[in-house]
Design a protein with these regions (language model features):
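Polybasic, low-complexity RNA-engagement segments
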Residues: 1-44, 300-468
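Conserved class I S-adenosyl-L-methionine
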Residues: 114-122
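Class I S-adenosyl-L-methionine
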Residues: 184, 237-240, 244-348, 352-354
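S-adenosyl-L-methionine
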Residues: 147-181
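Conserved SAM-binding loop of SAM-dependent methyltransferases across substrates and taxa
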Residues: 125-138
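Class I SAM-dependent transferase core
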Residues: 71-110, 155, 445-449
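Mobile active-site "lid"/loop adjacent to the S-adenosyl-L-methionine
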Residues: 150, 185-227, 243-250, 269
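Helix-to-beta-strand junctions that scaffold the AdoMet/dcAdoMet cofactor pocket
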Residues: 137, 232-234
């Protein structure tokens, strides 16, 4: 898509980068297509590799090509396929993410091996949160937040499909985290910005760009950081990132954090072949991606550590909440506390159960742990979250294998027939759970979440395959 760049942007890039690098950037933005990349989900285990390497029945197959060098299990694709029609995407087998933003992996690997409680502040649609959840210590709790309601629902969907139980999804503004004083070891703030990294993908981003908007974004970004800063522990780490190139929203804000909030910049070693500019810019024309800036900072130790006050969890009155069958506990593996919230059974990681009341007191929680089951009349119906979770004990439910066409019908929430016993059945595609049906014999009730269904009546057959 040809792009006409604003003259002020061209001048700014020449001043900031120099004439030759600025020309390479602008030529790439104006005359080349966006790259396409995905990350595989290792938490789905052997199923991911096995499923993605199976011979494909649909006519369109896209193979993974070159690896993204700064992120494990990440690959470029030669072109952008119709991801919607790949059942493996809906099963959480992989996530479509812009390659430059995967550089977050280097910060996680190098500095976050002992992180216990992590906040992704502006997390929708979920690219960085799924990456964090993959590479953080297995027992760490990740709070993935998004203030905008519609985007928060998308975030909750993507985190559910990724399937890790030590996750909590919230819908809050940055200021809501201020009372959670010194709760988080790491805060990732991929802040709203002027969107220069979207120029190749979105013509509106080009049309909306102006120096006035850049400076407004800078002010907003500083306000966001000041609001959330009290929630970061002394000595904790802040990942500050944008999808812009300009210094006002990038380096100038990093200097402001160090000067006004109290922090130091940490070094992230880079391979010279990656083409990373400075600390740390990914520029189209130099790196294979859409554009990204990231800086990792450590909060100064001078502020006395003040653990957040414990909150006593309210116990339901006798008879107020229904009991649930003990057998539900055997549906998942791992150490969990089992809770009943509004006719829903939740398995929450025991290692962070003491923190849960505090988080629920201050935050609007959309999803947490593993939603096991919902009470439907007198029947406990297994939840879709359970089907997606890596904690699910396979073999708990009868399973039915779906063909490609049957899988798409299921994902459209159409009627499907299964050769399985009556009752709740886990339907799969290439070994990957897609969700549940309730088999009634002559027919099966489709239990796929209505709001997540494929709405398109057309089909462009596609599955991802491995050739690396």
């Amino acid at each position: 898509m040809p792009v006409n760049l604003p003259s002020d942007f061209l001048s700014l890039m020449c001043q900031q980068l120099g004439e030759a690098p600025a020309k390479a950037l602008c030529d790439a933005l104006c005359s080349t297509e966006p790259s396409v990349s995905v990350r595989l989900n290792p938490w789905k285990g052997v199923e991911v590799r096995a499923a993605l390497s199976t011979a494909s029945s649909p006519s369109a197959v896209s193979s993974l090509s070159a690896p993204v060098p700064w992120c494990p299990d990440a690959y470029y694709l030669p072109e952008r396929p119709a991801f919607t029609f790949d059942p493996q995407l809906h099963a959480g087998a992989y996530y479509v993410q812009e390659a430059s933003s995967m550089f977050l992996a280097q910060a996680i690997i190098r500095y976050m091996s002992s992180a216990s409680v992590v906040l992704d502040l502006c997390a929708a649609p979920g690219g960085k949160s799924t990456l964090l959840r993959t590479l953080l210590p297995d027992g760490a709790l990740l709070v993935s937040n998004e203030p905008v309601a519609r985007r928060a629902q998308v975030l909750a969907e993507n985190m559910t499909k990724w399937g890790h139980p030590s996750t909590l999804v919230t819908q809050n503004f940055p200021a809501d985290f201020s009372p959670l004083r010194h709760v988080f070891d790491v805060i990732v703030a991929d802040v709203p910005c002027s969107g220069e990294g979207m120029f190749r993908k979105d013509a509106e981003a080009v049309g909306e760009w102006s120096m006035q908007n850049v400076l407004m974004c800078q002010e907003r970004q500083r306000s966001i950081l000041a609001d959330v800063w009290p929630a970061l522990k002394p000595g904790g780490q802040l990942v500050y990132s944008t999808c812009t190139f300009n210094r006002f929203e990038d380096e100038d804000n990093v200097d402001w954090i160090c000067r006004e909030l109290g922090a130091e910049v940490l070094d992230i070693p880079c391979n010279e072949a990656w083409g990373v500019t400075g600390h740390y810019h990914f520029l189209p024309g130099t790196t294979r991606g859409e554009g990204f800036f990231l800086s990792l900072l450590r909060k100064s130790d001078g502020e006395p550590l003040q653990p957040a006050a414990a909150v006593r969890e309210r116990r339901p009155k006798p008879g107020r909440e229904p009991a649930f069958p003990a057998a539900l506990r055997s549906w998942v593996r791992g150490e969990f506390d089992f809770l009943v919230e509004s006719d829903t059974v939740i398995a929450f990681p025991s290692s962070h159960a003491s923190l849960r009341p505090l988080l629920r007191r201050h935050l609007h929680v959309l999803a947490e742990g593993v939603c096991l089951a919902e009470l439907k009349g007198r029947d406990w119906q297994p939840a879709h979250s359970l089907a997606m979770s890596r904690a699910l004990v396979r073999g708990t439910f009868p399973e039915a294998v779906l063909t490609y066409d049957e899988a798409l019908a299921y994902l459209r929430r159409e009627a499907v027939s299964v050769a399985a016993p009556r009752g709740y059945v886990l339907v799969t595609f290439r070994g990957l759970p897609l969700g549940f049906v309730k088999n009634l014999g002559p027919r099966a009730n489709n239990l796929y979440p209505t709001e997540w269904r494929i709405r398109s009546g057309f089909t462009t057959p596609f599955v991802l395959s491995v050739s690396v």
